Design a protein with these regions (language model features):
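Histidine-acidic residue clusters that define the catalytic metal-binding segment
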Residues: 1-6, 145-186, 218-223, 349, ...
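An aromatic/glycine/proline-enriched structural segment found at the starts
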Residues: 2-5, 149-150, 154, 182-251, ...
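C-terminal regions of mature proteins
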Residues: 187-192, 328-332, 336-413
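His/Glu-based metal-binding/catalytic segments typifying zinc-dependent metallopeptidases
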Residues: 20, 29-31, 145, 215-274, ...
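Buried hydrophobic packing residues in well-ordered domains
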Residues: 12, 30, 48, 86, ...
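M16/MPP (pitrilysin/insulinase) zinc-metallopeptidase core fold and M16-derived inactive scaffolds
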Residues: 27-89, 155-158, 269-285
Length: 413
């Protein structure tokens, strides 16, 4: 159970407070309700570029990292298709340093040509190293537009193409900041050995004078129901042939999302999972195989990926893989397997709650989804899942007309 308090500033900033007297550290976590799905299709990669720009200094503080490091702290951030999340960890007695830094860059990020050019080059280099010049690196650049035809999930967080980052202007950057980086579009969580009233005082001191803005209205194109099997084969200089089966799955706020998560565990989370046992251990068709979900807020994907063993064809794999999926669709899962999966997810969630940063981030995420208390209800939702529900959802999702398959064929030197 993660206990928390909640309050809201007049400028629209939602604040969560989580008290933990057992740690000398504090976490300041800021979630901005903006991700790659909020970008224009002609100007992608901006949410991720902004993650980098936010460390380029603000008007009053030219170097973000140095003051935090002097206070014994560290910071980092991540961007997804749905959110951008910034976090600072530091000794509790120095928490005002983090509040000073975070509030100042929310108020007045430094828009200098030098900062834009430096961070643009960093992102371009990341694009090249991680997505263009790395084996299997461009998989998501190919798979997303295969699986999605209308929704902005059809491009990766890094961006649709490198030219969008290269051509980003100062006016583009300022407009993106003005639209998304303000109190009404943020959720702040303060976690650690700090009383609620002191948290309220400090947050009002540092954030209270930031001007209010209207939360942007999000109107995204709805992804049509997929009615046909899609496939694409690309050739790349990679060590082994690889495969990526993607299935559309329910959105994050639905009960079926949790059921699909357990189904992915049944298929490929561990060495005892169905796909690993059948395709790797028994048939030796693959050298690796995994199943997981993207965790998206809107309609996401269940992914099955892996690499073929030598001298195994995609056709051999395909027949065996669909046979495993058919078993899950038609046969009721045993009580023993169901219990094992639910016990495992309980253990994983309990372990995740051990870390102060994880608690702060999850509180922010669930507040964005509708109510921070959802983090405390999550385990009960998982534990209520039945074998009958898994069979029903598997029937809904694991069918050929709901699948987009990307094959990566190895070109031998």
């Amino acid at each position: 159970m993660i206990e928390f308090n909640r309050f809201k500033l007049d400028n629209g900033l939602t604040v969560l407070h989580h008290f933990d007297s057992t740690t000398p550290m504090a976490v300041v976590n800021t979630l901005y309700d903006v991700g790659a799905r909020d970008e224009s299709e002609e100007k992608t990669g901006f949410a991720h570029l902004f993650e980098h720009l936010m460390f380029g200094g603000s008007v009053n503080i030219p170097d973000f990292d140095a003051p935090l490091q002097r206070a014994g702290g560290e910071s980092n951030a991540f961007t997804s298709n749905d959110i951008t999340n910034y976090y600072d960890t530091l000794p509790i007695q120095n928490i005002e340093t983090a509040l000073w830094l975070e509030s100042d860059r929310m108020l007045s990020l430094a828009f200098t040509p030098k900062s834009l050019e430096v961070q643009r080059n960093v992102v371009i280099e990341e694009f090249k190293q991680r997505y263009l010049n790395q084996p299997y690196g461009d998989v998501w650049l190919e798979l997303r537009p295969l699986a999605y035809k209308q929704h902005p999930y059809k491009w990766a967080t890094i961006g649709k193409k490198i030219e969008h980052i290269e051509e980003a202007t100062m006016d583009d950057v300022k407009a993106f900041f003005k639209a998304h980086y303000h109190p009404a579009n943020a959720i702040l969580c303060i976690a650690g050995n700090i009383p609620f009233e002191e948290t309220k005082r400090l947050v009002k001191k540092w954030y209270g004078d930031i001007p209010a803005s209207l939360k942007p209205q999000r109107i995204l194109p709805k992804e049509p129901v997929q009615k046909e099997f899609r496939e694409l084969t690309i050739e790349r200089k990679v060590p082994n042939d690889a495969f990526y089966y993607s299935f559309k799955m329910p959105e994050r706020r639905s009960f079926e999302y949790y059921v699909t998560d357990i189904i992915s565990d049944a298929l490929g989370r561990e060495k005892s999972s169905r796909l690993y046992s059948k395709l790797k251990k028994e048939l030796k068709l693959v050298t690796s195989i995994n199943a997981y979900i993207t965790g998206s807020i809107d309609e996401g994907l269940l992914i099955i990926d892996g690499k073929l063993s030598d001298d195994v064809s995609f056709e051999q794999l395909d027949a065996a893989l669909w046979a495993v999926l058919e078993d899950l669709r038609t046969e009721l899962m045993s009580e023993a397997e169901t219990s094992k999966l639910l016990n495992k997810i309980r253990t994983v969630k309990e372990f995740q709650e051990q870390g102060l940063l994880n608690r702060a981030m999850n509180l922010c995420l669930y507040e964005l989804l509708g109510d921070a208390n959802g983090v405390n209800e999550e385990n009960n939702l998982y534990q209520s899942i039945t074998a009958e529900q898994m069979k029903a959802v598997a029937n809904q999702i694991l069918k050929k007309e709901n699948c987009s398959l990307l094959r990566v064929k190895s070109i031998k030197e």
